[in-house]
Amino acid sequence: PDATFFEVITAMSFLHFAEAATDVAIIETGLGGRLDATNVLTPSVSLITRIDYDHQYLLGDSLAEIAREKAGIFKSGVPALSVKQEPEAEAVLREAAEKVGAELRFIGKEIEFSSRFCVTDESGAHMRVCLLGERMRYMHLPVPLPGSHQADNCALALAALDMVGGKTDEFDESVIFRGLAKTKNPGRMDL
C-alpha cells in the first residue's frame, strides 16, 4: 500500500533530525499510538495527554478503547507518564504498561502536582503549576496559555524533563520560568 501524507512527512522529519544531528526531538503522534507513523521510534519517555472522545472513528467508541490505542506507544523498558485520566482509561493504560514492561507514572498520583488559576497585574490571567519531581522541584511556574489542560500539559513536560533531562544542575529553573512566561499559542482559544 502507498504511504499516507502523514507517514511521508513523518519520515521526512526523522531524516531531517538525523541529518541535523538533533540532540532531542519532541515527537507528537498524529492521532493515536498503536498504528501511528511515529510509533517506529523508541523514545526516551512516552507521554499521554488527557484521553477524551476524539477521533472515535479511528480509535474506538469508549474511553477504554481509545486508551488502548493510545497505550500502543508504550515500549518495554521506556518510562511513561500520563496526566490524570478517567478511571476506565487509567485502568487500561496501567494494564497495557505492565503488559509491555513500561513503568507508568501519573501526574497528580505518583508525581505530586498542583495548579491554580491566578490573575496578576504583571501576567494577567494564567495558571500556576507546582510539580515535585525526583530531581527537581518546580514551584509556582506561570503557564500563560488558557485552560487547566495547559497546566496539565506543562506538568507532563516538566515531569519528562525531570525524568530524562540529564544532570540536575544543567537546568536552571529561572530559564524554564522565563520560557513558560513567553509561551504563546496564537489562534487557540483567542476571541
What spans do the regions from the language model cover?
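Short glycine-dipeptide loop
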Residues: 43, 76-78
